[in-house]
Amino acid sequence: MKLAALLGLCVALSCSSAAAFLVGSAKPVAQPVAALESAAEAGAGTLANPLGTLNPLKLLLSSLGIPVNHLIEGSQKCVAELGPQAVGAVKALKALLGALTVFG
């Protein structure tokens, strides 16, 4: 059971990382004409991605009984209090831990 939870966590983290990479590396497209822009905004609600709200990490944590909303609120408070320098340090630490787990 623990192995399945670990595998699910690894898949969820890799999916989130891959999605963040793809979103960050996407090239900006040309701006639509002003007349089409309002139509695009009106249709955005009807054509929303049904899987856009599906977050595998949230599903995994909530299936394990971990309160996800409480974790999200706490992390948002920490980020707001610490500022951008601390966020950069946490990202660097996360990258270092990721490298250690790959080579360790």
Swiss-Prot record:
Q: In which tissues is it expressed?
A: Highly expressed in lung and prostate. Also found in mammary gland, spleen, pancreas, testis and liver. Detected throughout the airway epithelium in lung, with highest expression in large airways. Found in lung submucosal glands where it localizes to acinar and ductile cells. Not detected in respiratory bronchioles, alveolar ducts or alveolar epithelium. In mammary gland, specifically localizes to luminal epithelial cells.
Annotated localization = Secreted
Q: Secreted among the record's keywords? A: yes
Report which superkingdom the organism of origin falls in: Eukaryota
Q: Write out the GO biological process terms.
A: negative regulation of cell growth; positive regulation of myoblast fusion; regulation of cell population proliferation
Q: What molecular functions are annotated in GO for this chain?
A: cytokine activity
Primary site of residence? secreted
Database matches in Pfam families: SCGB3A (PF20490)
Alphabetical keyword list: Cytokine, Disulfide bond, Secreted, Signal
Signal peptide span: 1-20
TM spans (from-to):
none
| Gene Ontology CC terms, in alphabetical order | extracellular exosome; extracellular space
Q: Is Secreted found in the keyword set?
A: yes
Q: How does it assemble?
A: Homodimer; disulfide-linked.
Q: Which family does the UniProt entry place this protein in?
A: Belongs to the secretoglobin family. UGRP subfamily.
Q: What does this protein do?
A: Secreted cytokine-like protein. Inhibits cell growth in vitro.
The protein's name: Secretoglobin family 3A member 1
Lineage, highest ranks first: Eukaryota, Metazoa, Chordata, Craniata, Vertebrata
